[in-house]
Each structure stands twice: as structure tokens, then as C-alpha cells.
Amino acid sequence: MATAPSYPAGLPGSPGPGSPPPPGGLELQSPPPLLPQIPAPGSGVSFHIQIGLTREFVLLPAASELAHVKQLACSIVDQKFPECGFYGLYDKILLFKHDPTSANLLQLVRSSGDIQEGDLVEVVLSASATFEDFQIRPHALTVHSYRAPAFCDHCGEMLFGLVRQGLKCDGCGLNYHKRCAFSIPNNCSGARKRRLSSTSLASGHSVRLGTSESLPCTAEELSRSTTELLPRRPPSSSSSSSASSYTGRPIELDKMLLSKVKVPHTFLIHSYTRPTVCQACKKLLKGLFRQGLQCKDCKFNCHKRCATRVPNDCLGEALINGDVPMEEATDFSEADKSALMDESEDSGVIPGSHSENALHASEEEEGEGGKAQSSLGYIPLMRVVQSVRHTTRKSSTTLREGWVVHYSNKDTLRKRHYWRLDCKCITLFQNNTTNRYYKEIPLSEILTVESAQNFSLVPPGTNPHCFEIVTANATYFVGEMPGGTPGGPSGQGAEAARGWETAIRQALMPVILQDAPSAPGHAPHRQASLSISVSNSQIQENVDIATVYQIFPDEVLGSGQFGVVYGGKHRKTGRDVAVKVIDKLRFPTKQESQLRNEVAILQSLRHPGIVNLECMFETPEKVFVVMEKLHGDMLEMILSSEKGRLPERLTKFLITQILVALRHLHFKNIVHCDLKPENVLLASADPFPQVKLCDFGFARIIGEKSFRRSVVGTPAYLAPEVLLNQGYNRSLDMWSVGVIMYVSLSGTFPFNEDEDINDQIQNAAFMYPASPWSHISAGAIDLINNLLQVKMRKRYSVDKSLSHPWLQEYQTWLDLRELEGKMGERYITHESDDARWEQFAAEHPLPGSGLPTDRDLGGACPPQDHDMQGLAERISVL
């Protein structure tokens, strides 16, 4: 009896030990001879591909290479055995030709020329395929609209929305949030495709021949029939999907994670604010609060009863970072992009949480040990809850559009254009379908909108206009009163003109005033009639804020509990401003006193290092505080830096400016009381910018030897005496400077809130771990130690800090002198230091000796050129 052939391992249909005999009692023997089919001349070679117990008849085009045969084999695996496919299958298979005349039944196919007409080619899995290869199977994700409630199979939360709520895998049928696609492991089971695929053959005798219902196909036809091949094909594959398709995290990341040690989950009782299912049993977590358990590291959710059945496969917090870009298999529409971004932004992550703001500040060269050590007891630098994140909406909303006739005092020819009014300007288009426009009238340049008054420029033989738009450079006469005949062309008529006049007036008003309700039983008063209670500018009393400033409601610079900060413009000068709009109806008396305290303090201050207050407007419902608009804050600079921390040179530059501004405040007996990186604003996008202090809501008037006891400020930056409700003085600000300096150089907060601050300060190993403090100078650590003194009498003052050797450096002096040259004012350095630094430059061969002018900052930075270059690019993006 003939010897049974050895079946390839790892593919379906291969008989194993104890397998039942084939039906009918037939023994497995060598495949019987196949009846060759005669192809058309020049059409190619027809042969059979066998995978396990399945055979498919294929036609290989003439002059094809071995790569085509491998593609055909991969296509059959994807069609018949989707659960057995994996990433890189193309490179992990071998082709053997059955040769009954040879002692070795299977002959390795080395080229397409080895395959002859009617041959049987066996597909065998190579020994180079590892266990990890079988575990990595990318998902084929497409945007899907669900008709019934569905839950994400990654995070367990419900997929919200009416349409296009999430992503569905075409292979396994699992559902995911769009935001979760960044973290989905490549573990597609292919169960959905397996249900749709054909069954394998029962024995080797039932061979699919070239019938109409079978698969006699060419390489092109077989490739077209498989739509899921894209993530598994070599670069030569041309198959694509018509639908938007996405994949999860990169394959290389999965390979790295498979080699990591998996640890048990750390479950904590959690209260869920949205419907969530248990990721172990796939059942809903029921209840109003404390519904289940959540792993504090990987955010795995489960029932309390299911926690014991959850495997020890926690991969830690590093996976939930959202830093892996989602690859796109095909192009997708702008609507899909916006929907994806909206879903990502509305991810339910609490602002300031570790999952959103965790910084990876450790250098790669310090190794895994340094990273683990630096992350044990430290809180990463983050934006605290009281802070405001600067954001700008993508586009303005169209308030009104339509055809309008108009002329001006500079051109009396009456024209007709398609006007479009948004929150920032009036655009005059040639027609309603083109993007080409005739003119733009920014709302910030409109001084007044008046009823028709000047009829001296009305073109002869035409009707008078309806209203006038007055700017500093021109006056526009808009609309046309109807003549003797009713109706008329579009853009004419008193009714249309009144609609445009009302819309423009409303656009010129602050957005908050347009919907302010009037008190019951009272006639609605004119909300635009405002009075200025405090002013530092040449503006008369009892004027309308809309006549002085244009507030852009779509440019939100920040928001808080009681109001919103909008961008704006001064109408006459075009100067950018920031307008803090506060709702007095939601404003407690205590916070209102803080606001008035801030305004009163800022009114008395005039210093280049302190934000400038222009004026304050007030109505019965609202308060408008107008200040100069700056570029960003110091926290954004730290978070956007390459290593999550600032170089020493830049930190010296910024800390010196902060100390100079504090010296001016303390000279006037003003203590800021809420100093933190969020309240240190950048005046420009320069790599070495001017900084200004802002947010004086907690500021206090404290004499040189006076003390206060009221609770103020942000706890993360507050001195111990405030947290312990003890008396404090102006040295409170110096503690905050020490914390700012610490977080700037390290990217982490110096203290753990669960332990005593005094004990932490005395533990040098805890305060200054090797990563990253081994790369920071001893002078910086010494200054921080003198600022973070629990005893107030030992804490450095402003003048003592400015005289510290770490800040008294020639390079820092050069940087500050260049800034003063740009500002045209000397307020940081002093003339008495010039001779000392000139002598120092003569004795030490340092670049840039003498008074600096315009020079390249990067060229004068010996140790940290690469840091400053990367930081300059990020600051320009802010």
C-alpha cells in the first residue's frame, strides 16, 4: 500500500493524531491524477492549488512570476480560511509541486517555470512563521451606522449618535469607537468571514474542476474577489476597497507588546456616567453609581463577579495614549474626517487626567529602568482644572446671505453682489456659487450702522438707499428703496434692507448680549448701552462697547465657570484684544469682588512684564474686561517641547522675566498669590519670547512685614503655609516660582499630595531622581532648594533669587539684552552690569561679546542647540 503523504502543518484540513478516517473507509493516499484542461493557446498555465483538503483550479497568465502564484494562494486562504490568515502570510508560505515519479513526492517550486500544465501545487506554511505571527491579524474597520444600540468591544462604552456611530470589522464583526481605533490590538478572528465562506472539501476525490459554479479564475479575478487583502498584501497588490477602511495600531507595536510581561489588573470601584458593558461577560453594568470595577492602568471594565475570571493581561497605562496615528486604507470624505475628529474630541476624557496629559519626558537613551523609576511617585505636569486651554473654532458660521445692491462714497456706480455675513466680516461675492469675491468688509472696521441720511451721492435716475455702513476709510450705501412698480430685482426693497441692517447690527454686538432676557414686568432695555467703570485708555464714559471693539464669538480663547474669553479687535486701530465676558447672574458675590480686585490692581500697574488692562464695561447682566491679547502661555511651551521639559538656557530666560515682574509687584505691595505656568503668557511665537503675568483675581495687597490668612490660589503651586491655613506673606510667590522652575526643568510636579511636603523635601532621592536631574546643573537644584523652603524666613526673596549664580550667567544676559533691544525698552537688566559683563567677555572667549544686536540665538547656544531648534519649531506652531 502506498505511503500516506505528509500534510503541511498549520493549515486547516490537515489530519492529526486520532483523526477519523475519511468517509467511505478510504485511506488517504497520494492525490489521483488530475484531468488536465486544455487552455487556449497563449492564455497561460492551468493547474490546481491544494491547501489542506481543499483544491482550487486556477489559471496562471503567461509570463507570470512566482509572486503571482503566492498572491493566488493568499487569496484562497483569505476566502476559505479567514481565521487562519495573519499579517505577513505572503512571506511565510512555501509552494511544493506534487511529483509522483520522484522519490520525494513534494518538490519545492522556485520559479513559475517549474509549474507545468495540470500540476498540483501544495501550499505549506514555512518554519519561519512564529507564534506571534498567528496572533497578529489586523482588523478591516469601516465606518458603520447601527440601527440598534451597540457597545464598543474595546472600552465597553455605548456607541452614541444617530448615524455613523462607530467602526465595524469586516473580518470578525466587532464594533469600536473611532477614538478607540488607535488602541485596538490586531487580533481579528475572522469569524464573520468564516461564516460567509464555503466549506472545505470532504476528501481528495471531490475536486473543483472548471465548472461554471466553481472557481476557474485568473489571478486578476481571484484578486478582485477578495476585498480584505489590503493589509496582508505586498506592495504590488492593487486591490482596494470602495468604502472607507481603517486599521488599528501599527503591527510593530503589537510585536513589541507580545514580548512584554503581562501583569494582573489593578481594579478599583468605578461609577460610570454612560452605558458600559462588562468586557469579560459582555453584559451591561447596571446601576446608578459604583456599577463595576475599572483597571486604573488600562481602563478595563468588568463586573465585580467577573474580576476573578479576567486574565492577567494588563499592559499598563502606556497603551492608552492615543499617540499612534490611525492608518487609512483608502481616502475618505471630509465629512468622515470631521466626524472622526469630533468623536476623538468628545472622548469623555477628563481634562487634566493622566490619559490626556501624561508626559513622556524621559530620554530614550536612559533605558527602561530609568523610565520606570521616574514614573513611580511623580505626577506628570498637566493643565490643572482651574486653567483655561486656548482653542479656536475652525470656521465662522454664516449669519445671513443674499443679493444686495450697494454703492459707496468713493464709487457712486450702484453694484449688485451676493453678500455673506459671518461672525468676522461681510464678504461680497460675484455670485452665489463661486469663491471669487469682490470685497471684504471686516466687522472690526465698521464704526456705525445708520439709517439713510446722506442722499447727496444718490446716482441720477435711481432710488435712494436704505441704510449706511460707516468705516474709517469709506461709507457704504446699502439697499434701494422700491420705485413706482411693486417687486423688483433681488437685492432691492425696504424689507430686505431692514433684514440686513438688523443682522449687521446684531453681528456688531457682543454675542452674549443678543440673548440676554429682560426682567419680568419690565420693558427690555437697550443692552448695547454700557458704561465703563474702569479705564486705562482714552475712551469716554457711557459708550457702547460695540462701537469701540468688535468681539468675535467664534474665536474662543478660553472658558471658565462664570464666563468666556473671546478674541476681539479695536475698531479704529485694528489692535487685537482679549475680552473676558462674565455672566453676573451666575457670578457669586465673592468672585465678583475678586474680579473688581483684579481690575483695580491691573489699573494701577504699568510694566512690560504684566498684562495690560485696557478697560472694563458693565451692564446689569454682564461684565466685559478688555485686555491685550497674547500668544499663548508657558504651560503650552512646556507641554509642546520635544522632551516635555525646557532647556536650562530657556528656563533661565523665562524665570528672570518672571522675577523682574514680581519685583515690580512686590515693590507696590502686591502679591500675585496664584502664580503658575498657565498665568505666565507669551507675547510672541519667538523661541525666546517676552512673558507677562496675568490673572490677578487672587492678588492681595500685603505689606513687607504683613501677613494674610484667606485661602487663595491653585493647590499644586501653593506654599505649605497657605495649605495649612497659616498666615502668609509675599514669600508665597517665591514658593510658586520654585515650583514653576521645577516643572519647567523636569516636566513633573515636585511633590506627591499623599505625603508630607517637609518629608519629601528632605528626601533628595525623591525630589531629584537621576532622570532627568542628572543632566541638570547643580546651580539650578540649589536655587530650587532655596525657593522651596517650608520656613518662610529661609525662603529666597526676589532680589536674592535674581542674584543667584545660576541666573547670573553671561549667555542669559545676552538673551535678555536682545529681548530688550526688540522691545525698545530696558526693564530687565541694568546699565551698571554692562561693564562687568564686558570685562567677563574679554576674559572668557565666549561668542557675542559686547552689547548684542540682531543675531541668531541658535548659534550662541553651545550645549543645547538641538533642544532649542526643536523647541523653536513647536513654539511657532502655538
Curated annotation (Swiss-Prot):
Its cofactor is Mg(2+). Widely expressed. The modification Phosphoserine is found at S30, S197, S198, S200, S203, S206, S212, S214, S244, S518, S706, S710, S876. Changing S710A: Abolishes phosphorylation. Loss of Tyr-717 phosphorylation and any other tyrosine phosphorylation, and increases NF-kappa-B activation in response to oxidative stress. Its main location: cytoplasm. InterPro entries: C1-like_sf, DAG/PE-bd, Kinase-like_dom_sf, PE/DAG-bd, PH-like_dom_sf, PH_domain, Prot_kinase_dom, Protein_kinase_ATP_BS. It is found in: Cytoplasm; Cell membrane; Nucleus; Golgi apparatus, trans-Golgi network. Changing Y717F: Abolishes phosphorylation. Decreases substrate affinity and increases catalytic efficiency. Increases Ser-706 or/and Ser-710 phosphorylation. Increases NF-kappa-B activation in response to oxidative stress. GO terms for biological process: adaptive immune response; angiogenesis; cell adhesion; cellular response to vascular endothelial growth factor stimulus; endothelial tube morphogenesis; intracellular signal transduction; peptidyl-serine phosphorylation; peptidyl-threonine phosphorylation. This is Serine/threonine-protein kinase D2. It comes from Homo sapiens (Human). The lineage of its organism: Eukaryota, Metazoa, Chordata, Craniata, Vertebrata. The gene is PRKD2.
